Each structure stands twice: as structure tokens, then as C-alpha cells.
């Protein structure tokens, strides 16, 4: 973004949301950061000049208040980063209904509520929306039904905005990160390491195993996803609408059917051997 805009970033207390808020702040944009935890948001406020508005993404009154806070502070609203999210596991046959409800409330209903409150202002500003989904929206893992379903639905929610509001100047796109070093991912890796008895390597060993088939051979960093989000919000992406951008080190380019044959899984040297 090379002109100064007003952007709401949800789930900004850590990880991709925090990195995005910092990136936009460095560019001189006016950022309103939201999340459930107050202290990380207040720290961002002190360090970047963002406006902190702690709130529950699934509470309609809180979401309306978030949009009003942005308008009261800056008089306009140009962009949304729909990043707030939680993860819960389970299969369709054994998941806890409470987990399903929690995930859908935060990962899907929350973005819908924010879009509903913000769209009249985004239309006036000819603004942009970026949804932070996941590669789980494109391809699934074992025991991941609530999270994957919510992220696939978020993807289509954003595409609906692209279709329904494109003629009014609003763009909506989606990024789909793979494993990224965030607090949520760190917790999951620590749990994986414990369940797999990985020993002293702990979460780092789990990251290595989880990204073994990623062509770039590593997890992503929050800033790398933030850079993609910043571009999609910017005038440089003015004709990009309804797009789904994997930010995944190439993992969605792999054909799982060849993995068992190890055609290209072992890293090669610089000669291509």
C-alpha cells in the first residue's frame, strides 16, 4: 500500500495478525488492531501507534463497536484483514459439538459480522478485504474437520464479497498459509512432539517433520504472509479480486501420489542430482 489507508486487522495479538499490523504501520497506514487479549494489543499500540480495540470476534455488538472505533478515530475505513481464528481438531464422527461451535463462531461468523458492519464504508472507500484462510481450505489433513471446514467457508465468504461487491469497487482476496511459526502453531507442534515422543528436539523436531515435504523445506514466518496481505490490500493489486493465494512454500504444488516413490522428496544438490 503506497497511500495512507485505514485498515482493521483482527487476531492482531500475535502471529500473522501482529506481523501484518506492524507492516502496515511501518508504511504509515492507520491500523486498528483487534483481538481477545488486551495486553498484546496495547503493546502494539505503544510500539506502532495502532489503535487497540480488544473485542470478541463473534460478538455482534463488539464487532459493530470495532468499526465505529475505526470511523471515530480516522473518519473512514479502507481495508479489512480477517485474521482472527482458532483451531480445534476432530473428525465428523467424533468431534465435540462445542469445539465445532467455537471454531465456526470465531473463524466464520466473526468475519461475516465484520464484513456486514464494514461493507457500507468499504464501498464508499472502494476498499479491499483479505481473508486469512489456510492450506487446509484447499486440502485436508487427518482429524481436522472443524478447522478445515471453517477455513474453506471463509474462502468462499470472501469470494462472495468479490462477486457481490466488485462492481462497487470492493476487492476481496484470500491468502492460504501453510505451517507458519505462530503461537498457535508452536502450541500444536509442542503437542505433536509430545504425542510422537520426539524427545529433546520437541517442537522444533515437529516443525521439521511437518514441513519435510514442503519444497522450501521449512515453515513460513509471519512477516512473509504479512507481505502478501499488504500487497493484496495495495493499489498494486487493483485488478486482483476473488483470488486465492497460497503462501505455503510450494506445498500445494506437490502431487501426494508420488510421495511414496520419493521422486523429488530427497533434497538435491546444486547440480540437480
Describe each model-derived feature in a short phrase.
Residues 120, 163-164, 238:
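Alpha-helical segment proximal to the catalytic Tyr-Lys
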Residues 134:
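Residue(s) in the substrate-gating loop at a strand-loop-helix junction
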Residues 13-15:
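Conserved glycine-rich cofactor-binding loop
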Residues 115, 150, 158:
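Active-site helix of classical SDR
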Residues 166, 171, 240-242:
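Short, small/polar-rich loop/turn modules that mediate ligand/substrate recognition or access, typified
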Residues 91-92, 96-104, 210:
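Substrate-binding pocket helix/loop in short-chain dehydrogenase/reductase
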Residues 174, 197-236, 240, 249, ...:
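C-terminal helical subdomain
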Amino acid at each position: 500500500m503506497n497511500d495512507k489507508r485505514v485498515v482493521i486487522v483482527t487476531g492482531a495479538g500475535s502471529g500473522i495478525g501482529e506481523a501484518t499490523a506492524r507492516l502496515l504501520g511501518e508504511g504509515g497506514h492507520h491500523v486498528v488492531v483487534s483481538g481477545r487479549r488486551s495486553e498484546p494489543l496495547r503493546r502494539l499500540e505503544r510500539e506502532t501507534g495502532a489503535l487497540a480495540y480488544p473485542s470478541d470476534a463473534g460478538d455482534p455488538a463488539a464487532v459493530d463497536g470495532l468499526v465505529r472505533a475505526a470511523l471515530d478515530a480516522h473518519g473512514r475505513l479502507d481495508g479489512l484483514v480477517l485474521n482472527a481464528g482458532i483451531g480445534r481438531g476432530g473428525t465428523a464422527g467424533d468431534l465435540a459439538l462445542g469445539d465445532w461451535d467455537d471454531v465456526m463462531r470465531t473463524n466464520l461468523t466473526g468475519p461475516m459480522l465484520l464484513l456486514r458492519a464494514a461493507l457500507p464504508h468499504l464501498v464508499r472507500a472502494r476498499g479491499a478485504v483479505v481473508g486469512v484462510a489456510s492450506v487446509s481450505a484447499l486440502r485436508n489433513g487427518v482429524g481436522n474437520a472443524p478447522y478445515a471446514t471453517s477455513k474453506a467457508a471463509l474462502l468462499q465468504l470472501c469470494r462472495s464479497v468479490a462477486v457481490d461487491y466488485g462492481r462497487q469497487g470492493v476487492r476481496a482476496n484470500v491468502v492460504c498459509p501453510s505451517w507458519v511459526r505462530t503461537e498457535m502453531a508452536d502450541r500444536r507442534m509442542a503437542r505433536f512432539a509430545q504425542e510422537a515422543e520426539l524427545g529433546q528436539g520437541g517442537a522444533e523436531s515437529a516443525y521439521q517433520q511437518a514441513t519435510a515435504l514442503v519444497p522450501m523445506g521449512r515453515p513460513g514466518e509471519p512477516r512473509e504472509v504479512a507481505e502478501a496481505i499488504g500487497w493484496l490490500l495495495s493499489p498494486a493489486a487493483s485488478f486482483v479480486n476473488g483470488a486465492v493465494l497460497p503462501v505455503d512454500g510450494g506445498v500445494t504444488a506437490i502431487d501426494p501420489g508420488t510421495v511414496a516413490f520419493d521422486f523429488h522428496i530427497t533434497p538435491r544438490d546444486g547440480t540437480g542430482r
